[in-house]
Amino acid sequence: MIEKAADGLPFFTGGFYMKAVILAAGVGHRFKELTKYKNKAFFTIGQTMVIKQIIQYLLQAGIRDITIVTGHRHEDFSILKKNYPIHILYNTAYGEYNNIHSLALIAEQLNECWLIHGDTVLFKNIFKEAFTHTTFYTMLKRPNGAPVRVVEVDEQHHIQGFHIDRGERRVLSLLGVSYWRKDAQMILLETLSHLHEKEKKRFDGEWEELLQEVVKKVEVDAYQLDRKYGGDLNTMKDYQEIVETYDRYWKSMRK
């Protein structure tokens, strides 16, 4: 249950303040030259940077404990620290390890905590939602040239597992937003403690691979977001589709 503290910030009855971690260390190799001198988090949709929109939504939801894990183009994030009450955690090994390493750096924080990919585009403030279980946002989307992690759910929208899809049809896939509670965090920490070093260095490795262990042992819910409210930037085709969504649904409202 969410309540309000004396300062107006949201917290759960267990005494934990809601917080957020944004993972933004990756290079974004599929964008080639476009990400050579720019982190994907700094791409603009309309006139707003992706990372700024995430931060603004978090602040509007009353979440003040915000950490950004940086790596590629780390120096560019300093301007955000000047303008917003955020913490910066530099993953110095971002070029050597996959994003499992970024997750390991902040896993101790994942108790009543939002976990967000820095390349997740949002047109709606989803951070005002309250969940009783660890919850992963999902969306129907096409792979668009990149493998996607398909979410397997039961009739109650509990996540049962995942598999990789490289086809052309739309599938229910993970969006880069999740809300973590203590039970799932403990399983994740245990899984990370047994992870072999070579798995952290595998180029195509992703922290979502660890979710199989989490969903086996605790209840994790899926929350499907309509495609008009956002998306993630895995490929150039994704970017083009998100721009089209913005132009169709949101451009006239944000003038």
Please give the residue ranges for each predicted region.
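Conserved beta-loop-beta/alpha segment of the NTase-like Rossmann-fold superfamily
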Residues: 78-149
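A short, N-terminal amphipathic alpha-helix
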Residues: 48-65, 105
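Conserved core of the sugar-phosphate nucleotidyltransferase
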Residues: 123-201
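Conserved alpha/beta core of the MobA/IspD/sugar-nucleotide pyrophosphorylase nucleotidyltransferase superfamily
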Residues: 16-20, 173-255
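Positively charged N-terminal leader segments that act as targeting/secretion signals
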Residues: 1-15
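A conserved acidic beta->alpha catalytic loop
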Residues: 72-75
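Short catalytic helix/loop segments, enriched in acidic residues and glycine
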Residues: 37-52
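N-terminal nucleotide-binding beta1-loop-alpha1 segment
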Residues: 15-35, 85
